[in-house]
């Protein structure tokens, strides 16, 4: 029996992207996590859309569990760039975020600061 460790779903996804490979994702707007589970073997990642859909924290958590069961990263498109949108999603277990309507380097830095804990950021 070998004791090899598999890369995390996020590390595998990043490596695939860094290698220039095509990554196929599924946009999730439905609240039922069965959608994520059903698509799990056919995609490289999920992006759960909170910008254009309403979803409870419980539904979001169900999608995270389904993605984790399929060893796929779950990215969340938040409705805005502020800490109140970003922090709860990261605290709930998102593997990454997609932030819409970012138009400047200063806005990008604000988003990064919202994602990182002090002293590198302001996430609390």
What do the PLM-derived regions correspond to, one by one?
Residues 22-28, 46-48, 74-77, 97-99:
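Hydrophobic faces of well-ordered beta-strands that scaffold small-molecule active sites
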Residues 1-25, 29:
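N-terminal amphipathic alpha-helix/helix-capping segment at the start of soluble metabolic enzymes
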Residues 34-62:
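Glycine-rich, proline-tolerant flexible connector loops at the mouths of alpha/beta enzymes
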Residues 28-40, 80-88:
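Short, acidic/polar
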Residues 50-53, 79-80, 102-104:
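Short, ordered loop/turn segments at secondary-structure junctions
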